[in-house]
Amino acid sequence: MWSLKIAEGGGPWMSSLNDHVGRQIWQYDDNGGTPQERSAIDALQAQFTRNRHDVRHSSDSIMRFQFSKDNPLPPLPLQVKVKGHEQLTRDIVEKTLRRALRFYSTIQANDGHWPGDYGGPMFLMPGLVITLYITGALRVILSEQHQLEMCRYLYNHQNNDGGWGLHIEGHSTMFGTILTYVTLRLLNQGSGAHAAMEKARAWILDHGGATAAPSWGKFWLAALGIFDWSGVDPLPPEMWLLPYILPVYPGRMWCHCRMVYLPMSYIYGRRYSSPLTKLTSDIRNEIYVVPYEEVNWDSARNDCAREDLYYPHPFLQDLLWATLHKCVEPILMHWPGSLLRQRALAMVIEHIHYKDENTRYVCIGPVNKVINMLCCWVENPNSEAFKKHLPRVLDYLWLAEDGMKMQGYNGTQLWDTAFAVQALVSTQLLDECGSMLKKAHHYIERSQVQEDCAGDLRRWFRHISKGAWPFSTRDHGWPISDCSSEGLKASLELSSLSGDLVGDPIPAQRLYDCVNVILSYQNPNGGIATYESTRSYAWLELLNPAETFGDIVIDYPCVECTSACVQALAAFKRKYPEHRSKEIATTIRQGSMYIKNVQRSDGSWYGSWGVCFTYGTWFGIMGLLASGETYSTSASLRNACSFLLSKQLPSGGWGESYLSSQDKTYTHLEGDEAHLVNTSWAMLALIASGQVERDPTPLHKAXVLLVNAQFENGDYPQQEIIGVFNRNCMISYSAYRNIFPIWALGAYQCKVLGH
């Protein structure tokens, strides 16, 4: 039986800065669980499979089942449902909150964070399985049970037409389908032994075969040895030898972009292809519409299925790749040009090792994690670097009733915990949540980054880190502007509470360090991006080679990061008014100007990291309020509130489809369904802006929805996918289903009913 292990190490090849606090891995025990418990898990899995085309998102039922044994649910107040035109009372809302808090306390890990599913993208696991197959480590790292659950996951998320999408709710794409098909074959699923595999192969061939895969798909197929490198657009490692002053220099790109193309360029530069085996030879024969020997590889370079085309290549880009492919690469592949290639490869692998070591081999994300691991093996199959990579694979795997998936990060630990603290404090029910806050404080304190990366930061293209907070764990360590800000906000909230209740506050100097990082992020336009200040120009997007994603080349400022930083600095300024007061005031003022400048004509803001306009508008409103704007004095705030009110559904809630993110147009969920997380974001924004003084009716209607949606055990339902990145790929934030209804009802109880 599977069990979730928290804050445990993984043997002599692993290191940690804080005793693995935040690490979450799933382990299988052949003798674990009673027959009744195993039967209960089987029933959860079977139920998901039965409903898989209607309910795409898992509910983290296996984790919840484990916690129900480890942390039994305490007695709950009697549940109250509001009927008809009954009014909400403080008593009803308080009972609902106490029920929610008591349940929420049962799913908190011992180290203080709340574990949860961060899956959704379908293109992550294939890279892992392909890499492990190439390196011969597939069955070393992935037990038979791992492989069984991975297959379960992939089959569960196959669309009716036989294909797989970019993410679990998306339409079928060649990227999702061909990589998933290859993955299942590498996991010993026969091409014709399963009807699902037959349908998948038919989908691939009906849509043009392997040559119609987008560039990232072609890369993985070429590395596996079933696609010719001459059919892949160039990824020259020599780009890293260019001077930094050039806008196209990779070190000036968004860190996620450069961290993926850095190891890709190493594999491409070496033209590494895994030797064919009987299995990969069979796969190669199954995925092309013409015999492999007859494929026109030059034509294949520019081929991409229309289902995958979110960002078609401009002509300028195709011309550049053709020139590099036909004129430059032949020179670099032969002496004396090969001398330059060897120098570039040496520089690239040096950077890869630096990145690995500074994240304890977690790496910044799952895509570059597995390509970095492949590079280390290609360089030296017996290297310590490769051995250090292997145990960290488990950090990315998550199990739910839909199977085992590869997550979009090694978790959302700090991010969710910082939000959770603010949600818990909003309820003012400290008698219920004191223990949770104390454990959460422990997690936040242990997860702060307390040093910059080693060496010359400019040489390694790293931003300062000391004092920041990461998205997940300290061992991961990449600092992010909004994570630092939410970590700072949570720390300030905790410092205002009794030390006897939550523990000693984080020392002021460490908060000063965080402020120093936040101040360093602001760009000349007042906006703040994610990991670093913006280093190059938006026109560089013309060179975006990834047909499936938008806005990936540079680190763009966004309303969420800017607002989070403004809110954090304003909160810090209230507690420490003398510390760098002029710089903080300037940053807040310029951030506020940016927020107003990027507001859309309808009053909304586009959310880059959540679905979508509801999320962005919550941040936009909160940022302007933190900067000192008010509803009566700010047209921006009035327009934003009008936008939110215009999208409220007859049910009292808000419900926004992921299509809003993809199409950049507000789109309701199918059937005008309300989403509890969208509803909570809208409530928080409207409550903060003073809606209770104008007309509290919309807030009352929304709060009734949240009260009535609560389960008997105090939990809330998992609904449609609510996270997004790069405009077109959706991702799960499973903890939001608890955090935001608690936060919204807490604010409603104290600021609306208590008004």
From Swiss-Prot:
Cellular component terms per the entry's GO annotation: lipid droplet
Parts of the chain that traverse the membrane: none
PANTHER family in alphabetical order: LANOSTEROL SYNTHASE, TERPENE CYCLASE/MUTASE FAMILY MEMBER
Its job: Oxidosqualene cyclase involved in the biosynthesis of cycloartenol.
Gene Ontology BP, a term: pentacyclic triterpenoid biosynthetic process
UniProtKB keywords: Isomerase, Repeat
Gene coding for it: LCA
The PFTB repeat ranges on this chain: 97-142, 147-188, 390-431, 511-556, 588-628, 637-678, 699-740
Pathway: Secondary metabolite biosynthesis; terpenoid biosynthesis
Lineage: Eukaryota, Viridiplantae, Streptophyta, Embryophyta, Tracheophyta
Site, Transition state stabilizer: residue positions: 415, 471, 609
CDD domains according to UniProt: SQCY_1
GO MF assignments: cycloartenol synthase activity
InterPro entries in the record: SQ_cyclase_C (IPR032696), SQ_cyclase_N (IPR032697), Squalene_cyclase (IPR018333), Terpene_synthase_CS (IPR002365), Terpenoid_cyclase/PrenylTrfase (IPR008930)
Known catalytic reactions: (S)-2,3-epoxysqualene = cycloartenol
EC number of this enzyme: 5.4.99.8
Protein name: Cycloartenol synthase LCA
